Amino acid sequence: MPNRAVLLVNLGSPDSTSVPDVRRYLDEFLGDERVIDRPAQPFRSILVHRIIVPRRSPNSAHAYEQIWTKDGSPLIITSRNVQQKLAATLGPETPVYLAMRYGQPSIASVLGQIVADGVSELLLIPQYPHYAMSSWETVVVKVYEEAARQAPQLRVTTVQPFFDDADYIEALHAVSAPYFAQPHDYVLFSYHGIPVRHLCKADSSHAHCQIVNDCCNTPSPVHATCYRAQVFATTRALAARAGLAPDRHSVSFQSRLVGEPWLSPYTDHELERLAKAGIKRILVLCPAFLSDCLETLEEISVAGKETFVQAGGESFTQIPCLNDQPPFIDFLANRVRTWLQASHR
């Protein structure tokens, strides 16, 4: 067996749309201290497992029912397709494994297989273009913790957030360009939200985020861990590549929880505002998601469209994520080849 391999890690999905399966998934997901990080224990566990998850599970199960396919979860299906296509592109000398941060296949079980297969060098590619403690960071921490437990000798290299990588932007443009070419009035870039507090928590200097005027547009080393600055950078790069007019596109944030301020403006509010302002034809793009999932297929394509149309909009199009399209497979393959070449030196 080859001694070098690739590990793709995505978010995950419930095993089914049943309330017990969804509850089990949410218990693991929302129980992650990097997703919901307060209050202090034991109160956080009580809040998550006795209040939030029981209340959310039935509604979340219904939402999953709206997007579930005969083959199961769209995110899992697409992630497997990415794994298979990347493996076919790289060839048998570089196996590609797939794990989910929450649910199955778990990071622990997949790393067990990697160790059993005799892999000594591993390239970890979190399926997140941007840094956030609740997405990219939790994947990396979990993989390194599990690797240290199962295989201390395993050498793990991690692909850093690629939010402004020219090849990533080109892949986004290749998939989005046919939609940009269609008649439309406005493009809304909708990114997954995070608590504002998480931005400040990620600022190791404690002197920039929410302190410096226009902090996300003021160059700083702390942008290496600033989710908001990174999504702005993605938006600027893709808008420039596509030639989008500055007054015909903007950024919003979706998927917020209640209880504290999250990044704004909120996507549902923006869809309503834009429709009431006379925007009739809107394109919605979700670059933080590499694979279409609950947040794009239900929250945007179903609920978002309903919000926009009810407020007076007429044409609503959610531009698909990169999914398993050739430009994204090529992007991943190039990242792997760069690593393979570097590890030969």
Curated annotation (Swiss-Prot):
It comes from the Bacteria. It is found in: Cytoplasm. GO terms for molecular function: ferrochelatase activity; metal ion binding. GO terms for biological process: heme biosynthetic process. It catalyses: heme b + 2 H(+) = protoporphyrin IX + Fe(2+). It comes from Opitutus terrae (strain DSM 11246 / JCM 15787 / PB90-1). Its main location: cytoplasm. Pathway: Porphyrin-containing compound metabolism; protoheme biosynthesis; protoheme from protoporphyrin-IX: step 1/1. One of its GO terms (cellular component) is cytoplasm. This is Ferrochelatase.
